Structure formats: structure tokens, C-alpha cells
Amino acid sequence: MRSYEKLEKQILDQRLKDFQYEVIPDELFPFLRCLIPEDKEAIKAEQTNRGPIKATAVLVDRLKRRQKGFQDFVKALRKCGSEHTALLLDPNYNFRGK
């Protein structure tokens, strides 16, 4: 694992409590190309059965397993109008939503 990947996973773990109430995971799916169908299915099931807060935790867990998961997540947040959440994760605009 590269050092920046480790840092990205740490950021997701540390900041989850700060954004878990703001994210609706299935709204981000069109922009999260790193997720495989099984990931999306598990996240959607969690969102349907237990709500978006619990589903966000599953989303973060799945993102940490995927290459470029962090970058895709930050870009997806920006594309969906959640700039303030993206800034929590990427305050230096290393990953833009384009």
C-alpha cells in the first residue's frame, strides 16, 4: 500500500463522523466508477434497510477497498453539490469534480 493510500484511508476513517449525516450514498453512484455492482448492491440494501447514515459507513468501507476510491468519492461529492463535505476530505483541491 502506498503512503498516500494509507493517508486517504485514515482521512476517511477520521472524518466519517463529520459527514455521515450529510451523504446520501445512492445519489453518488453515477460518479463512483470505482465501485463494483456488488458494492452498490450492499450499500443500497443497507440504505433501504437501515438508512443513509449506516449506508454511508458501508460506502466508506467499500471505497477503502477500491483503487482510487478516495479520489472518486471527493469528485462525486463535488459533482453532487456537497462541496463542504469534499472540503473536509480534500481541503487543497487535489481532486476536482471534473
Residue locations for each model-derived region?
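Death-fold homotypic interaction modules
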Residues: M1-K98
